[in-house]
């Protein structure tokens, strides 16, 4: 498992003057969900995140109030240790989705998608 060394920015990683400029765009920017209902967040990359090693380096993090970001999903769809199975990731190339099958109160926070294919 390849984990990024650092989390850079909220929705965007930008390397000025580089041919590897990648813009990550999440939608929606905010979401109100009733507990027990499903939720979905989309993430679009300006470039394919498929690496020559065959893996796609897309990560999802959750930052709960007053806490550091915690890894939920790595390589598009693999749940990190201890992450409940109500969280799932899908997608390929440039389009990705994080789904929560049944939202719980503890799921409140800021969700981030992050690419790990081009790091400074």
From Swiss-Prot:
It comes from the Eukaryota. InterPro entries: Ig-like_dom (IPR007110), Ig-like_dom_sf (IPR036179), Ig-like_fold (IPR013783), Ig_V-set (IPR013106), IgV_Light_Chain (IPR050150). Immunoglobulins are composed of two identical heavy chains and two identical light chains; disulfide-linked. The keyword Cytoplasm does not apply. GO terms for cellular component: extracellular region; immunoglobulin complex; plasma membrane. Residues 21-120 form the Ig-like domain. Residues 75-81 are annotated as: Complementarity-determining-2. Gene3D superfamilies: Immunoglobulins (2.60.40.10). Residues 44-59 are annotated as: Complementarity-determining-1. The lineage of its organism: Eukaryota, Metazoa, Chordata, Craniata, Vertebrata. The gene is IGKV2-29. It comes from Homo sapiens. Disulfide bonds join 43-113. This is Immunoglobulin kappa variable 2-29. Residues 1-20 form the signal peptide.
């Amino acid at each position: 498992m390849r984990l990024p060394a650092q989390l850079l920015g909220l929705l965007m990683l930008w390397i000025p003057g580089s041919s590897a400029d990648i813009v990550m765009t999440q939608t929606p920017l905010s979401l109100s969900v009733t507990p027990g209902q499903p939720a979905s967040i989309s993430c679009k990359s300006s470039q394919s995140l498929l690496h020559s090693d065959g893996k796609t380096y897309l990560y999802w993090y959750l930052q709960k109030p007053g806490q550091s970001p915690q890894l939920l999903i790595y390589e598009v769809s693999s749940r990190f240790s201890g992450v409940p199975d109500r969280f799932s990731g899908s997608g390929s190339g440039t389009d990705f989705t994080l789904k929560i099958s049944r939202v719980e109160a503890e799921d409140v926070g800021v969700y981030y998608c992050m690419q790990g294919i081009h790091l400074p």
